[in-house]
Amino acid sequence: LTNGLKRNVERLFDDKGHVFLLALDHAQSGVMTGLENISSLMDKLAFAPLDGFILNIGLAGNLARPPFLRKKLVLRTSFGASSLASSYPQAHLNHVSPETALSVGADAVLMMALVGGEDYSSLQPLAADIDAFHQYSIPVVVEIIAAEFDKTATFDVQYHGARIAAELGADAVKVFYVNGFEKVIECCPVPAILAGGPKDRDIGTVAKHAVDCGARGFAFGRNIFQAKDPLEVIGSLREILG
């Protein structure tokens, strides 16, 4: 890594080596419950103990104002298809240039790695995109999902996918909790950030075990913004992460 990229990767994490992100990048779902008015939601959580937000390009401007100026912007730069599409895509292609990411003040970018199926159509462009952002010393976080989406939270997808993404140059990976999660962390040479995913498990229990296994952060969405009391959930998760 270049010195500039090293500095930028380190600055993504706090002094304890942790990062807590609120994921609001659900454009594929159109209007998701809890995200009817993202700007209003962000205002309500402005002073919550979050380190930053994951946003799509069209909402990045929400962080260009007090009190968000010191919050991290992790910019999602890839997109697949909407939930209304007739079929699920085999690749989420990048649609934001490094220059545009810099122009909106992104601290890092986030893109998908789809593994399984015809994953060469996803992984080859991913490797090139990582390299393109690294030319500008922009950190890249890669989220691991399955080409058959319902297999995303399976051990093989997360275990092998995280390692593949790291070897293609990812600076951190966003991974889903699976049985055997400690092996995912053990065999991944870059920091792992836990994704929230569906609300079918107690998020506090999952989060604590993930941190015990070595996860370096959280990137949660629905488990927070669809909660009865998002601030309470954020507070309890921050306590777990430290």
Predicted region positions:
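N-terminal basic/disordered segments at the start of proteins
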Residues: L1-D14
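A short, acidic, flexible beta-alpha connecting loop/helix-capping segment that sits on the rim
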Residues: R222-K228
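Alpha/beta enzyme core
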Residues: D14, V19-G61, R65-F68, K72-S82, ...
